[in-house]
Amino acid sequence: ATCDALSFSSKWLTVNHSACAIHCLTKGYKGGRCVNTICNCRN
């Protein structure tokens, strides 16, 4: 639940998307972003 835990965003930074992307990178994906509260990894 990377997108729930850190879901705060500002004009400059969206922390949940970064956390999701890092989560996906550690799993061998090219990155990812949050869609609602679900972290979607890119292949």
Swiss-Prot record:
Gene Ontology cellular component annotations, sorted alphabetically: extracellular region
Q: Which residues form each disulfide bond in the chain?
A: C3-C34, C20-C39, C24-C41
Gene Ontology terms: biological process? defense response to Gram-negative bacterium; innate immune response
Name the Gene3D superfamilies for this protein: Knottin, scorpion toxin-like (3.30.30.10)
Keywords (alphabetical) are:
Antibiotic, Antimicrobial, Defensin, Disulfide bond, Immunity, Innate immunity, Secreted
Q: Name one Pfam family in it.
A: Defensin_2
Domain of life of the organism encoding this protein: Eukaryota
Q: Where in the cell is it found?
A: Secreted
Residues in a coiled coil are: none
Q: Does the keyword Membrane apply?
A: no
PROSITE patterns attached here? Answer: INVERT_DEFENSINS
InterPro entries in alphabetical order:
Defensin_invertebrate/fungal, Scorpion_toxin-like, Scorpion_toxin-like_sf
Gene induction: By bacterial infection.
Family per similarity comment: Belongs to the invertebrate defensin family. Type 1 subfamily.
Functional description taken from the UniProt entry: Antibacterial peptide active against Gram-positive and Gram-negative bacteria.
- Name-wise, this protein is Defensin
